[in-house]
Structure formats: C-alpha cells, structure tokens
C-alpha cells in the first residue's frame, strides 16, 4: 500500500519555488562546481532565500500559520550570505526574480538584520543592504 510521508514545510516551500520557471532558470544558470559537485553559487542562492521569506511572510499576513523560526531563518540567511558577496557579482536572473529581490530589499531595508546579532563581525547592517542592492538591483 501507499504510506503518506510528511514533508517539512520548508522543503515543500522550496519545491514550490523550484517549480516556477524563472526560479528553475535561476538555479540552472547560477550553478558552480565545487570539487566536481554542482552547487548553487552564493549569488544564485540568495534570491531563493529571499523568495522563501516573501512567500512565508505573505502566508503569515494572509492568516496562515507559519513557523516564525523559518521566516526569520531565511531573512538571517540572506544577511549571512550577503557578507560573502564582493558587490560586483552579476547573477543571471529574470525580471520576475529581480522584481522579487526588489520587494524583498524594500522590506529588508526598513528592518535590516544586524550582522552582530548573527555573530558576524566587521560588517554593518547598511553595508549588507548596499551590497545586496549593488548585486541585485543594478
């Protein structure tokens, strides 16, 4: 017989994003190789984290129950990952993905994560915002 399998909401959310053509293209076009293994580049991963945060925030605003830790985790991950960017990266992305990044950055800029709260030294919240803008909103 068939046995139902519980899939974590975070995995389900990521799967839904991957079914989107624009995000699938983002995944394919921003692959890198690490020791012969295909991985997603940092600049390619950040839009997925931002989109997950946007989707979860919209579900929460619509009255659905969402895991608050998951919402904050995606936002914090964007901050952590942004500290790895130099600012000159130019990820291949569609206008739809760019529009999502613009929406995310508008929300993020009004309430940025303090890198110090994530134990990241030597980088301020405004520097994170600026590098994200230079990479995704150029």
Please provide the spans of the model-predicted regions.
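Compositionally biased terminal segments of proteins
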Residues: 1-138
């Amino acid at each position: 017989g068939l046995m139902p399998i519980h899939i974590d909401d975070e995995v389900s959310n990521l799967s839904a994003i991957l079914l989107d053509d624009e995000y699938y293209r983002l995944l394919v076009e921003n692959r890198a190789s690490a020791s012969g293994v295909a991985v997603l580049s940092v600049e390619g991963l950040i839009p997925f984290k931002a989109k997950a945060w946007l989707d979860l925030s919209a579900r929460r605003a619509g009255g659905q129950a969402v895991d608050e830790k998951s919402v904050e985790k995606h936002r914090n991950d964007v901050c952590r990952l942004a500290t790895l960017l130099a600012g000159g990266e130019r990820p291949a992305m569609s206008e739809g993905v760019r529009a999502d990044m613009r929406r995310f950055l508008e929300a993020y800029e009004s309430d940025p994560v303090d890198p110090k709260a994530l134990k990241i030294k030597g980088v301020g919240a405004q520097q994170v915002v600026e590098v994200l803008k230079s990479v995704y909103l150029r």
